[in-house]
UniProtKB/Swiss-Prot annotation:
Region annotation Disordered: where it falls in the sequence: 1-48
Function: Catalyzes the methyl esterification of L-isoaspartyl residues in peptides and proteins that result from spontaneous decomposition of normal L-aspartyl and L-asparaginyl residues. It plays a role in the repair and/or degradation of damaged proteins.
The protein's name in its UniProt record: Protein-L-isoaspartate O-methyltransferase
UniProt organism field: Paraburkholderia phymatum (strain DSM 17167 / CIP 108236 / LMG 21445 / STM815)
Subcellular location, principal: cytoplasm
């Protein structure tokens, strides 16, 4: 280094790289033992020049974080708030949605696009038409009502198959073909004002009837199913269904006479109280079981006069038993 360069750069490499202090050295200002600094060994071929890093002392600055939520709203939080939020996020959270009650995936949600599409219900309606259902009001009603909303999520993939499915309490939701057949028999091309359903179950058949009749009255004797039907029907906001908790064998004399009565459970006969609540010219459709309980037949009862009824036995079916009382 020349004299001129020495004046401009008075410090040499030996001034920048110094040996660490010994463990027993003391700080000149405080008189306390100095903390030794670790010495990192370098590989044999590495450069001996050590980088000089100057770390300024800067006071912490609280920065705000700008984030956007799902709806696009901008949220501004301080760094301390973000740290507190992170601590809270580590705490266990309770389940917030009804669909999180089980660890299993929700089939109704994962298959929502398929199940709620019009094409799926149209295929069901095509099968009904192929099976002999011809009343356009009934076909339109079956296409309108989302059956998957009335079954358990685990059975949602089977909602539009022609199958009876369990709904709890030893009860079932009837096959779509049976629902359509019974409603078509009850209507028979006539305008329906008041209709009575015995056995609400999950509420599906009442929802279909509501698309065909002006007013639908439905009776359920099992309280949990009565509550479930209300829950299922509430999102659909159907204004012309009136649910009742009571004994279906007694009927609903206060709302009689009815243009049609549909019974969704099989007794050994059709209760006389229900026959008398038919308007003259009205129809009642019900499954009737044999005395030995081995078979059931779909039966059509037509009221032809004040004290006259005509009975026709039609299709072999299978329903849960019709019982009296409430539970």
């Amino acid at each position: 280094m020349t004299g001129e360069r020495a004046k401009r750069f008075p410090l040499g490499l030996e001034d920048l790289v110094r040996e660490p202090r010994r463990a027993d050295a003391r700080d000149a200002k405080t008189g306390k033992p100095a903390v030794p600094k670790p010495v990192t060994s370098k590989p044999a071929g590495s450069s001996t020049r050590a980088p000089v890093v100057v770390t300024p002392v800067v006071k912490p600055v609280v920065k705000s974080a700008v984030t956007k939520n799902a709806s696009g709203i901008v949220n501004t939080k301080s760094a301390s708030t973000i740290r507190n939020d992170g601590a809270r996020n580590q705490l266990p959270r309770p389940a917030t949605a009804a669909f999180e009650r089980t660890g299993a995936p929700n089939v109704a949600l994962t298959s929502a696009v398929t199940l709620t599409s019009e094409r799926v219900r149209e295929r069901m309606v095509e099968r009904l038409r192929a099976n002999g259902i011809t009343d356009p009001r009934v076909l339109d009603a079956m296409a309108m009502v989302p059956r998957h909303m009335f079954v358990d999520p685990g059975l949602a993939t089977q909602a539009y198959e022609d199958a009876a499915l369990p709904i709890g309490h030893h009860q079932t939701i009837s096959k779509p073909s049976v629902v359509a057949r019974m409603i078509e028999l009850a209507a028979q091309g006539r305008t329906l004002n008041n209709v009575l359903e015995i056995g609400t179950g999950c509420g599906y058949q009442a929802a279909v009837l509501s698309q065909v009749a002006r007013d639908v009255y439905s009776i359920e004797r099992i309280k949990p199913l009565y509550e479930r039907a209300k829950t299922n029907l509430r999102p659909l906001r159907i204004p012309n269904i009136r649910l009742h908790y009571g004994d279906g064998r007694i009927g609903l004399p206060a709302a009689a006479p009815f243009d049609a009565i549909v019974i969704a459970a099989a007794g050994l006969d059709v209760p006389q109280a229900l026959r008398e609540q038919l308007a003259i010219g009205a129809r009642l459709v019900a499954p009737v079981g044999s005395q030995d309980g081995q078979s059931q037949v779909l039966t059509l009862v037509e009221r032809t006069g004040p004290a006259q009824w005509r009975e026709s036995r039609l299709d072999r079916v299978f329903f849960v038993p019709l019982k009296s009382g409430v539970i």
